[in-house]
Amino acid sequence: MKLLAFRRLLRIQRVVIRYRLDDLILELPMLPWWLRLLGATLPWRWLPRRKLELTRGARLRLALQDLGPIFIKFGQILSTRRDLLPDDIANELAWLQDKVPPFPPELAVKRIEEQLGAKIEQVFARFEREPLASASVAQVHAARLKSGEEVVVKVIRPNLEPVIRSDIAWLFILARLAERVSSEARRLHPVEVVSDYEKTIVDELDLLREAANASQLRRNFEGSPLLYVPQVYWDWCRPKVLVMERIYGIPVTDLETLRDQRTDFKALAERGVEIFFTQVFRDSFFHADMHPGNIFVSTRAPWSPQYIAVDCGIVGSLTDEDQDYLARNLIAFFKRDYRKVAQLHIDSGWVPAETKVNDFEAAIRTVCEPIFEKPLKDISFGQVLLRLFQTARRFNMEIQPQLVLLQKTLLNIEGLGRQLYPELDLWATAQPFLERWMRERVSPKQLLRNFQQQVEQVPHLSQMARDTLERLSQPHAHNAPPPEWKGSRHDWLGRLVGAVLLVGAAEVGLGQQLEAWPAWVMLAGGVFLILRR
């Protein structure tokens, strides 16, 4: 392992010198003066150099390609972090292609047989040794099961784990070094970025996780005319082998073939947006790797086109708080209510409570007002989120990984949608989803359902009430600090009674009794007592 790490270090050094990445590093404004001086004395900087007619982004992209698949994937992920990188570098890294030569079919067969515990002929009636596709982590072969189903077999590359461990270790070393020498680098959280990447790549190595993701996404869209997800054949899935239904569709970028079959491009573009918002606001679970290589269009019913999604190795999930953040901010943004956007961030704790709302509002207005001078149909949701993240980061907002994934996915969907149908108006398509979701969030039925989820707390309520009343009656008993109640004791007792009524409403509303009038009465009374001032 140490020998491998040393060899990788030498390889990294050679690539840095070849593409003169040291020039890029020394240009960083966050670099301390003493490190800049030390870097200027590096031995190879005194040697004759060949002239590089390349931009800094192109040099970085080529260097990552030379360093191999793990660095390529890291560059791809970095390209989505436009809240961290300059646009010219992010745009160049987006061109990184995760394509590598296939490994020998004998190794693929050997790994499949090891994982399945059976000879290839015992499982498959036919197995095509020439792979359909090959990438940095895995390659895919076509096959037919003994039972007759046409399938694809995805198999993880052999001997990949040691290389990943070595490369990740060096990325962590570089990230920690950056944090130690520069306060500006610490603000960008490089160690956190590498940690997110490590989790992504480790997750991609577990094909059972990908199978589970695909299975859930398929279940979420079962019978839907919008999206089809291939079936997983669980009997033949293992950590390093995945067997799925083979699909036959048109690559979404093959516009000529789509035109030939008279596909409705407007419907196709709008359905892509509809699929995204359905995943986000209905399911709280979304395919986070929706680049064109993973999306196909069914050949059936081109007048009502259906998408086909593959490769569910990267997915995102959202909490209620994430959904609320996204919906409220997007609605406020498109109303150009920057004050509300700023206040939402502070009230929800996304930015520190001591943040001055006027300063935050002004910063948001400065970066977003130019965007909203365009017609609504020309505005990019992804760019709006990106500008918000960039601004909020300056106010010490911790950007959650799932929101970064969502922003990247939204940019992909937007780019694809406008490639298919340039007149696509995302706001017109998305607005009904956002407004319907907001209405449902405050509907009485949803409130009752939320309380039902918390009904396990009911047994603790009486003890909590007793403890609270004891503290109210003896606020300065013993050496306990006086509680910081907002308002009078009667206000707090009213809120306590309101809480009891709300929990009671949840109890009455359990099962099929959501329409029972006592539940509605208790709900109304509880809300009144809690919210009254």
UniProtKB/Swiss-Prot annotation:
GO terms for cellular component: plasma membrane. This is Probable protein kinase UbiB. It is a multi-pass membrane protein. ATP binds at L132, A133, S134, A135, S136, V137, A138, Q139, V140, K154. It is an enzyme of class 2 (transferase). One of its GO terms (biological process) is regulation of ubiquinone biosynthetic process. InterPro entries: ABC1_dom, Kinase-like_dom_sf, UbiB, UbiB_bact, UbiB_kinase. HAMAP family: UbiB (MF_00414). Disulfide bonds: none annotated. Is probably a protein kinase regulator of UbiI activity which is involved in aerobic coenzyme Q (ubiquinone) biosynthesis. Pathway: Cofactor biosynthesis; ubiquinone biosynthesis [regulation]. GO terms for molecular function: ATP binding; protein kinase activity. It comes from Pseudomonas aeruginosa (strain UCBPP-PA14). The active site is at D289 (proton acceptor). Keywords: ATP-binding, Cell inner membrane, Cell membrane, Kinase, Membrane, Nucleotide-binding, Transferase, Transmembrane, Transmembrane helix, Ubiquinone biosynthesis. The chain crosses the membrane at residues 24-44, 510-530.
